[in-house]
């Protein structure tokens, strides 16, 4: 069986449909930028001090901004400037970045998820969401970006690790592509990802237990009780601290991920952003048979109120996600 490239896969999906062709071109440019970012990441300490914080600077969400965060955004702006993208919303920029005034889509990105791990050689990545754009319907670019996640045409994430991997969905299942250095192309590795419905593995930053709501504490306590507790089975706990790395593990072998809100200042709604982290992750998760909520409400049903809005996130194996909701 011959290998299927990302371009061939996108061309077959898009056909002659103008909007689909715009989406396909956008995904190709995102993948292109991802390769450039992966090459920078791979140089590690041999390159500039990419893990260095930019003085007292913070991004639009208030997080410390590192050199590679900014460089990754620049790579994406350059690549998407050659795609039919009207506006780009980024974690690193306060307001939408205008690109093609005649663009058919808008894109929201986290240019470099997990950048706190830059210096430790842990997998990091890029998360993206693609939404339809109509100038007459959305003369304000912010309004175009504040569509619910269910309106996404495509979404996905790139992982910069031992392999450079693209996990994406065009609304017809979730696919995994791997970058082949010999041919300089992304090759289809898994055509239909299916997240197992049940799991014995969860991921959460357990050091924050004292700050959690009682519902979150009870769920984790029941998991820790193992086969002798109410769950009747032993659980493993895995936590990388890089959303794309934790997500790819779930897409590979199942599991559930929790980033709840807690009682710390600034953490009432967690730390993840709705439109460029939770929404795209929820989209590819559901397309792979999983589920994604804020603890109780389906992520893709939530109406965004602002571009950098935060949201608690629970996603992964659908039976476990549903079980977690029963605690709230």
Swiss-Prot record:
The keyword Cytoplasm applies. It is an enzyme of class 3 (hydrolase). Binds 2 magnesium ions per subunit. The keyword Hydrolase applies. One of its GO terms (cellular component) is cytosol. GO terms for molecular function: fructose 1,6-bisphosphate 1-phosphatase activity; magnesium ion binding. InterPro entries: FBPase_C_dom, FBPase_class-1, FBPase_N, FBPtase, Fructose_bisphosphatase_AS. Substrate binds at residues 113-116, 205, 257-259. Coiled coil: none annotated. Its EC number is 3.1.3.11. Keywords: Carbohydrate metabolism, Cytoplasm, Hydrolase, Magnesium, Metal-binding. Gene3D superfamilies: 3.40.190.80, Fructose-1,6-Bisphosphatase, subunit A, domain 1 (3.30.540.10). Its main location: cytoplasm. Homotetramer. This is Fructose-1,6-bisphosphatase class 1. It comes from Azorhizobium caulinodans (strain ATCC 43989 / DSM 5975 / JCM 20966 / LMG 6465 / NBRC 14845 / NCIMB 13405 / ORS 571). The gene is fbp.
């Amino acid at each position: 069986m011959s290998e299927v490239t990302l371009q061939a896969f996108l061309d077959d999906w898009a056909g002659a449909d103008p909007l689909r062709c715009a989406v396909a071109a956008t995904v190709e440019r995102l993948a292109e930028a991802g390769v450039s970012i992966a090459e920078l990441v791979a140089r590690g300490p041999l390159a500039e001090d990419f893990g260095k914080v930019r003085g007292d600077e913070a991004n639009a969400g208030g997080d410390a901004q590192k050199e590679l965060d900014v460089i990754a955004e620049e790579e994406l702006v350059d690549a998407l400037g050659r795609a039919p993208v009207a506006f780009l919303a980024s974690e690193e920029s306060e307001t939408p970045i205008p690109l093609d005034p005649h663009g058919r889509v808008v894109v929201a990105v986290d240019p470099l998820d997990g950048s706190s791990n830059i210096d430790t050689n842990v997998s990091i990545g890029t998360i993206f969401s693609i939404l339809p754009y109509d100038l007459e319907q959305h003369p304000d670019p912010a309004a175009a970006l504040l569509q619910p996640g269910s309106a996404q045409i495509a979404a996905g994430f790139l992982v910069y690790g031992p392999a450079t991997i693209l996990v994406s969905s065009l609304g017809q299942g979730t696919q995994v592509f791997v970058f082949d250095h010999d041919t300089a192309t992304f090759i289809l590795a898994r055509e239909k990802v299916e997240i197992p419905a049940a799991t014995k593995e969860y991921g959460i930053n357990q050091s924050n237990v004292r700050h959690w709501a009682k519902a979150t504490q009870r769920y984790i306590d029941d998991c820790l009780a193992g086969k002798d507790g109410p769950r009747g089975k032993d659980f493993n706990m895995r936590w990388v601290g890089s959303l794309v790395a934790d997500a790819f593990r779930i897409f590979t072998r199942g599991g559930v991920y929790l980033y709840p809100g807690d009682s710390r200042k600034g953490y009432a709604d967690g730390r993840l952003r709705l439109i460029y982290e939770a929404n795209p992750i929820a989209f590819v998760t559901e397309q792979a048979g999983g589920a994604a909520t804020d603890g109780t409400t389906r992520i893709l049903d939530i109406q965004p109120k602002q571009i950098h809005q935060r949201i608690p996130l629970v996603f992964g194996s659908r039976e476990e996600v549903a079980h977690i909701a029963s605690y709230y």
